[in-house]
């Protein structure tokens, strides 16, 4: 091999070893997400309604809906909808219900909706979430929602958490779950409009 051909061969090896394409293949973003319109456990009943199921790590789009539900004495609602998706540098989830009534009207609302998102920027993860409630009434009292994790005590040893948010952003990984309403009590656990989003940035 002459000197010219040797130089060309060395250049080709350098291109293959230091190619940006090889580096790009390692920079993989993975996603997580799930949205559930109504999750309830009470008196031997277990419900997961309008549940998207978990989003694959590769991302994609999942959605589900239900016209109405009525479990006597426990929960009734209309227009249950849930979506979760992941692509590019972000994942998002959303869930909503209308005409909600829980525990015979102890908790009621015209519209209940939650949203969450997780994004990557410069290799770092960030998460955001929000709950929207229209016409929320608990034990006959109108409730205005502002900050997350508003706790309200109700009769019968029942507690209500409004705009419940739990998040764990840490470096290149982040996850957040927003439960628009969470009712807990003796043998009762009800979550309305839950939206979880997560991401790992590489």
Where are the model-predicted features located?
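Bacterial N-terminal signal peptides
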Residues: 10-20
């Amino acid at each position: 091999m002459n000197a010219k051909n040797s130089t060309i061969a060395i250049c080709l090896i350098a291109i293959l070893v230091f190619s940006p394409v090889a580096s790009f293949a390692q920079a993989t973003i993975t996603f997580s997400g799930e949205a559930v319109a109504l999750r309830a456990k009470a008196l031997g009943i277990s419900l997961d309604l309008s549940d998207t199921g978990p989003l694959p790590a590769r991302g994609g789009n999942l959605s589900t809906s239900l016209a109405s539900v009525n479990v006597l004495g426990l929960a009734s609602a209309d227009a249950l909808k849930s979506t979760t998706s992941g692509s590019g540098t972000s994942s998002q989830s959303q869930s909503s219900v209308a005409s909600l009534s829980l525990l015979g009207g102890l908790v009621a609302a015209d519209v209940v909706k939650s949203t969450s998102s997780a994004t990557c920027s410069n290799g770092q993860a960030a998460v955001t979430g929000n709950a929207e409630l229209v016409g929320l009434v608990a034990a006959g009292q109108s409730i205005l929602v502002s900050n997350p994790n508003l706790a309200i005590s109700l009769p019968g040893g029942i507690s209500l958490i409004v705009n419940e948010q739990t998040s764990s952003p840490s470096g290149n990984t982040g996850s957040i779950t927003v439960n628009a309403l969470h009712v807990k009590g003796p043998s009762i656990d009800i979550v309305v409009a839950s939206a979880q989003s997560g991401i790992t940035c590489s």
